[in-house]
Amino acid sequence: MAAGAVVGAWMLVLSLGGTVTGDQNITARIGKPLVLNCKGAPKKPPQQLEWKLNTGRTEAWKVLSPQGDPWDSVARVLPNGSLLLPAVGIQDEGTFRCRATSRSGKETKSNYRVRVYQIPGKPEIVDPASELMAGVPNKVGTCVSEGGYPAGTLNWLLDGKTLIPDGKGVSVKEETKRHPKTGLFTLHSELMVTPARGGALHPTFSCSFTPGLPRRRALHTAPIQLRVWSEHRGGEGPNVDAVPLKEVQLVVEPEGGAVAPGGTVTLTCEAPAQPPPQIHWIKDGRPLPLPPGPMLLLPEVGPEDQGTYSCVATHPSHGPQESRAVSVTIIETGEEGTTAGSVEGPGLETLALTLGILGGLGTVALLIGVIVWHRRRQRKGQERKVPENQEEEEEERAELNQPEEPEAAESSTGGP
């Protein structure tokens, strides 16, 4: 009963701003105000009292009194004789003593041992494993706690029970860092385990932070549940409930993978195994940037969706296994319905138009070639005719000149 009353009084004192009386060990939160009462001091001046401090801020005992000056912003004596620390820091840890003399001459001493604390943020497990392999060391993850004072400790739990490192099946690598300015601590704890063959298949791990001061509750991380697989070496088989991966089959709906524009195609990868394998999708030989899943839905199929699809199933105890490939194609729709062999439709019209344009261009090119060839022949013919005409003119001139000479001779010899 007495112990309960003491604890209740302690909590009441701290809730009222940290005011305490008597010889006590007290804790104060960093950054909060703390008031220490000087027992036996008169409530009003004149007062005969003296405070002596030995903390991280002092090299020896420092003396404060009501008549003296306050110690900067660190501490000062209140009118009622109490000592006020406006914002407690790590350097304020230490011993505080007050000696007061009442008006009747009775002397009273008060001694305090002050420790400070800071609650860190909730711890968390970073880089957690996705699965564990039986019989070999595995890293479960790293537990991190930041911003606490004093440092405290980190503990790992398996299925709610504390794990004790034994250097064999369980090992822990710890690291403690202190911030150079704030003095607060950051803790790291890396857990390595070697699951036993035939042990639990779904162990649950968690981590807790235990403060360095008593009467402070622990902080816990969110639990993580991992799957344990057996090690396939030396002919050892899988765990009892494991089913090996067999043939991977890819089913397409509608059958054949042919669909009208805007239709829907559903691809289902069937890979029976226990546990279920991870399934990734491949199109035209390239992996698709999609999350793993056994079903691929292609709504409102367009030209960009056409191609060859396959799925790859990856099982922890096997290598990746790929299914056969299936093709997804678009069939055109005519005015009277869907016909696979129809010559109508925008696709064929575009093809016919393209062929017509190409044919016209070819005809024009042929005509231009014929015209150029014909003109070249005409030029060559004209070049040949020019010399022939010149020779004929010269011959004609020669013929015309020859008959005139004999006639002239005859006329000259035919006189009386």
Swiss-Prot record:
Disulfide bonds join 38-98, 143-207. It comes from the Eukaryota. Glycans are attached at residues 25, 80. Residues 23-352 are extracellular. It is found in: Cell membrane; Cell projection, Phagocytic cup; Early endosome; Nucleus. Residues 23-115 form the Ig-like V-type domain. PROSITE patterns: IG_LIKE, IG_MHC. Keywords: Cell membrane, Cell projection, Disulfide bond, DNA damage, DNA repair, DNA replication, DNA-binding, Endosome, Glycoprotein, Immunoglobulin domain, Inflammatory response, Membrane, Nucleus, Phagocytosis, Phosphoprotein, Receptor, Repeat, RNA-binding, Signal, Transmembrane, Transmembrane helix, Ubl conjugation. Endothelial cells. Residues 389-408 have a biased composition (Acidic residues). This is Advanced glycosylation end product-specific receptor. It comes from Bos taurus (Bovine). The lineage of its organism: Eukaryota, Metazoa, Chordata, Craniata, Vertebrata.
